Each structure stands twice: as C-alpha cells, then as structure tokens.
C-alpha cells in the first residue's frame, strides 16, 4: 500500500497499534533489568517482589537521580541501593517506578499508607496521596495495569496538587542552577550558585 493512500477499514482493523510511552521502560529495557537483577542474585521467582520493594521505597523517598535508598530488599544480602543501581544502568529510577505506579498505588491505598514525603513536597494533608514524584504514572496507559484496574482514580484536586508540586521543584532547580562553564573555584569562588537568592514565581494558571 502506497504511503499516500488511506488504508481501507479492513486493513486498518488488521493493524496493531500498541500503546507505548517514552515515560516508562520498554519491554527490552525490562528484559535487560531482569537479566541484571538475576546476575545480582535475585531469585527468578521473586523478581517482581524485589522490583516492588524498590518502587515502594521510592514512593516514600522519591525517585530522583539524587535519592539515597537504604535498607535491604526481600533478599537480606541484597540492598535496595543495589537494585536501584541495576535499574539505573538501563533507565532512570523514575521511569522504572512510573511503570509500577498503579500497582504500588493500589497496595498502599489498601493499607492506608500515604507517601511519607507529601509534606516535604508542600502538598496539603487532604491531597497527601498525590505526594510522590511518579504520580503521573497513574494516568499513563503504558504503565503496568493491575488486575481490575485502579482501586481508586486520582481526584482532579490530587492531579493539580501533584502537578503544582512538580512545577515548583522545577522552578527551584532552575533557580539554583549555575550557568558557569567551569567548576573551577577560580570561577565559582566556592559558591553553589552564581546568582543571589531570589524569589521564584510560578506562571499564572492558563485559561
């Protein structure tokens, strides 16, 4: 069929259009992580429980590249930091956690255990369930779907609270970023930023 020809209804129905997203790991990346965890010593029949132990820790502590995870995994001789290290060889920690967001959301809701870092993210108590940084995975159709779907759909207020917190973090990061091309103290004079502290205002809500 020529590229300038529209497909027939039957031809279109026969085509596969799988959902994909650059915000979650690909099947190939998950296979690579599986291989890495197996090499680390994670039992093949416990791969998912180890993955979810990591996601659960990030649900509370965050999934940025700077997060420090402590404590053991379900295998006492393997730490959560080691599992995170395997993941980060292939993809970002946040993308990995985002893939399992719906699973950990259901599990923590069932136990009434909201994310521990919601107050640190400046999220109000009534929106505390929005206080984890891969929350958007709940609305990503490419993320792993639990049997029966989400036990509770995020409310519009929770979505807004999480997006506001995410935007605030981005503005704070940009405010503290140095635009110097060198890290030499001859240029930086030991300062972490080359600009004076200043108030950063979020843009007005769009109509």
UniProtKB/Swiss-Prot annotation:
Which InterPro entries does the record cross-reference, listed alphabetically? Answer: Pltvir_coat (IPR000052)
Q: Which family, according to the similarity comment?
A: Belongs to the potexvirus capsid protein family.
Report whether Cell membrane shows up as a keyword of the record: no
What is the protein's known function? Required for genome encapsidation. Forms ribonucleoprotein complexes along with TGB1 helicase and viral RNA.
GO CC terms of this entry? helical viral capsid; ribonucleoprotein complex
Which species expresses this protein natively? Plantago asiatica mosaic potexvirus
Per its UniProt entry, which superkingdom is the organism in? Viruses
Question: Which one of the record's GO molecular function terms can you name?
Answer: structural molecule activity
Q: Which terms are listed as keywords in the entry? A: Capsid protein, Helical capsid protein, Ribonucleoprotein, Virion
**Membrane-spanning segments:** none
Localization annotation:
Virion
Q: Does the keyword Ribonucleoprotein apply?
A: yes
Q: What is this protein called?
A: Coat protein
